[in-house]
Regions:
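Structured beta-strand-rich core segments of catalytic domains in phosphoester-bond hydrolases
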Residues: 37-39, 44-112
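Active-site-proximal beta-strand elements of phosphoester/diester hydrolases
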Residues: 1-9, 101-113, 146
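Surface-exposed cleft-lining segments at the edges of enzyme active sites
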Residues: 84-85, 110-126, 162-166
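Metal-dependent phosphoesterases centered on the DNase I-like endonuclease/exonuclease/phosphatase
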Residues: 51-54, 127-214, 218
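Conserved beta strand-loop-helix elements of the APE1-like EEP
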Residues: 63-78, 197, 209-229
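Active-site beta-strand termini and strand-to-loop segments that position acidic
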Residues: 73, 97-100, 224-225, 250-254
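Active-site beta-strand/loop signature of hydrolases that rely on acidic residues for catalysis
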Residues: 7, 23-41, 104, 133-155, ...
């Protein structure tokens, strides 16, 4: 079972940069997408359907902003849109597909980098999302929570930890939340198989950061502990360049 998560930073722009050809070549069973920046009616999905994918979409109310999707070659038993909290669901941040024996979520966590108001919103989200997952995990114990978390967990996950110590995405309280999230029954699938430094999933467009690999690892596929023994492989694909993020891959034994 191959699951990929990818913040495409605008699905329409990504398609013009060869996204569909890449998808055909990579051929995941399930693709979780974040930051669609489009309504489903605005995107020609005919080539996606032709590749054998069913498409599930949750866009934000605000045009050209946020939004998550799941493209799946396996028909889910159920698809759940949102997390049931209006202020987050209006921003298109959570989508879940339930399959036989496991569930996959595509999640786009808020960024706080634009200022204090959005940072406060992000901190509210983190607490509320944790409570939501605590309850969800009782009903759906086999969870893959894939997406853009907008947080680097540890110093190894960011190119300049000292210089970014006061930056949103690497604040002590955000990292503490991530530590708590993992301690409540989740495994960072990439770190389960790779403990090396200099593996990142997002790079600023400024100052040639990507070419110099001055990045942040803010995209994760978190796997609930009952599924952890099924992790076969996990990787990051920095050579794939339709976005300021790159895709992250998880292979699970069926």
């Amino acid at each position: 079972m191959k699951i990929i998560s990818y913040n495409v930073n605008g699905i329409r722009a990504a398609i013009t940069k060869g996204f569909t050809t890449w998808l055909q070549e990579e051929n995941p069973d399930i693709l979780c997408i974040q930051e669609l920046k489009a309504e489903v009616e605005q995107v020609d999905l005919s080539e996606i359907f032709a590749l054998g994918y069913e498409v599930y979409w949750h866009s934000a109310q605000k045009k050209g902003y946020s939004g998550v999707a799941i493209f799946s070659k396996i028909r889910p038993n159920n698809v759940s849109v949102g997390c049931g909290i209006d202020k987050y669901d209006a921003e298109g941040r959570v989508l879940r597909a339930d399959y036989d024996g496991f569930s996959v979520m595509s999640v786009y966590m808020p960024s706080g980098s634009s200022g204090d108001e959005r940072q406060a919103f992000k901190m509210d989200w983190l607490g509320d999302f944790q409570n939501y997952i605590n309850a969800l995990k009782i009903e759906f114990p086999n969870l893959v929570i894939a997406g853009d978390y907008n947080i680097c967990h540890k110093a190894i996950d960011i190119h300049n930890p000292k210089g970014n110590a006061n930056s949103s995405g690497f604040l002590p309280e955000e990292r503490e939340w991530m530590e708590g999230f993992v301690s409540r029954g989740f495994v960072d699938s990439f770190r389960a198989v790779n403990e090396e430094a200099h593996h990142y999933s997002w790079w600023s467009y400024r100052a040639g950061a990507r070419g110099k690999n001055l990045g942040w690892r803010i995209d994760y596929q978190m796997v609930s502990e009952p599924l952890a023994s099924k992790i076969q492989h996990a990787s990051i694909l920095p050579e794939v360049k339709h976005s300021d993020h790159c895709p992250i891959v998880l292979l699970l034994n069926s």
